[in-house]
Curated annotation (Swiss-Prot):
Biological role: Sigma factors are initiation factors that promote the attachment of RNA polymerase to specific initiation sites and are then released. This sigma factor is the primary sigma factor during exponential growth.
Keywords: Cytoplasm, DNA-binding, Sigma factor, Transcription, Transcription regulation
Source species of the chain: Leptospira interrogans serogroup Icterohaemorrhagiae serovar Lai (strain 56601)
Pfam families to which the protein is assigned, alphabetical: Sigma70_r1_1, Sigma70_r1_2, Sigma70_r2, Sigma70_r3, Sigma70_r4
BP term (GO), one: DNA-templated transcription initiation
Gene name of this polypeptide: rpoD
Full protein name: RNA polymerase sigma factor RpoD
Amino acid sequence: MENLQSMPEVQKIISLGKANGEVSYDDINEILPDKILNSEKIDDFFTLLHEMGIEIVEEYTRNTLEPASTLVPKDDSKPARKKKESSASTSGSEDPIKLYLREIGKVSLISGETEVFLAKRIEKGEKIIEETILSSSILRANYIKLLPKIRSKKIKVYDLIRVDKMYALNAEEAHKLEELFFKNILVIQEQEKVLQEAVSKIRKYSETSKKYKEFKEKIDASTEIIHNAIRELGVSQKEIQKISQKIKSMVFRIKEIDRHFLKIKAQYGQDVRDIKAFNRFIEKNEKLDDIEVKMGVNIDEVREVIKDIRNNERKLRRMEQEAGSTVQEIKDWGEKIIKGEREISQAKKELVKANLRLVVSIAKRYANRGMHFFDLIQEGNIGLIKAVDKFEYKKGYKFSTYATWWIRQAITRAISDQARTIRVPVHMIEQVNKVIRETRLFIQEFGRDPNNEEIAERLGWPVQKVKMVKNVAREPISLEIPVGSEEDSELGDFIPDTEVETPVNAAASSILAEQIRQVLHTLPAREQKVIRMRFGLDDGYPQTLEEVGYQFKVTRERIRQIEAKALRRLRHPSRSKKLKDYIDG
């Protein structure tokens, strides 16, 4: 850090930052040399500015602005301006890695306290989702539904409920876990019956009556017992994801039906409830003219609309029965789950963005190992995302310490999976180095690249050996590597698909097929079919004489005779002249 601070370019930026309290990215890119911009020192530089209280901004926002040009002598201002203009004009063709580093450099580093805060936000979001699932009737209905499979050992208990140390469970602990599960499920089943009975009876009484209050107390008590039993069991992460996805799917279908009902209302100018009310008059053939006037369509279409409304209402009722709750409750669950997921997503995004520079610094250690640097960064980013998912702030480690292992593992695994799969022997590496050295010397002497013959002459090797060594020296490159000055294309866009037929060949094949059809059409039906089957003209699979004979219920010799006769007919000039142009050579 001290060596960095002693550099004149760094001192210049620090002076500018102290004068304004902030410094722009443009000034940093203009003043700092490339050896810092494209190295790990850039992280140290940003940390240095952060410690000095100098803010890095896109544009200067303060009135007391002192631009970088005021920190250099006046007679140097014109070249500096020219440099800035030239850099602006070439910004479209800048190295994508440099652009990426610049973008991630704009994200401020976060402290250990902020990491803990973000981890707690993730935990809070997970808690919202878990509480929603635990309080939903879908979970207990699902437990009861899976009970026979659990008893028959088709499903393991620890697949459904939360187990802190599943990997360390012995047979006795697993047995105790099953007993706890069955005990709580029995309580849930009993209280579910009490709850459903109370819910069905409470509807008969008004809210002010004594009976209503009795049943309300019974409902609250049963609900509390059920929730306590479920909370004692907990729910596995796998089951949380499964049920939350099911709830979101239900909410999506409910909203689709709601939108459909709104569309009906907009189209016919009548509320869905009012349209349904027309049905009792239609069944009695009463007020049909009035209904047609109100709806603006004939009575048959009104019947279809009512039928459509009832079908959709049946779908809603089926969902209510499946969930054991009302449509509104399902919507409320969905909103809570989405809120929790949003909280998790935002916190994870901030944690990932703040540590992208860590990925770059680790990826640099694995450069030149058979993978493009950008691919190393992307693989490292995948490892970073996994680290965010697995981070446990309560253990007291800094996130960067925890994430380094995941990032390194992702990069090393990618290198082993995607880099060279064939080991190059040591003697071949020596030969490759000889070719590279002679190529470099030739360029220094003559100012151009040598051809294979010239390298072979200098090394005293056969030309074929030079070609072979060059093939070994080839390094794999990414198909996603940007191509062109605008970086708007990828290398993969320019690789031809050899499996796709060219338009010219496709057109020629189509014309040839048509000519063959016309020629075959002049043969008798039996001969025509034999030729088609023998040469596979219909399905591309030629059949043997025996296979064709089996279909015609004749001997293979008879099929051979029919084929020979058909081919003699096809060789007649009146037929063969149509196909001669297609013979190669």
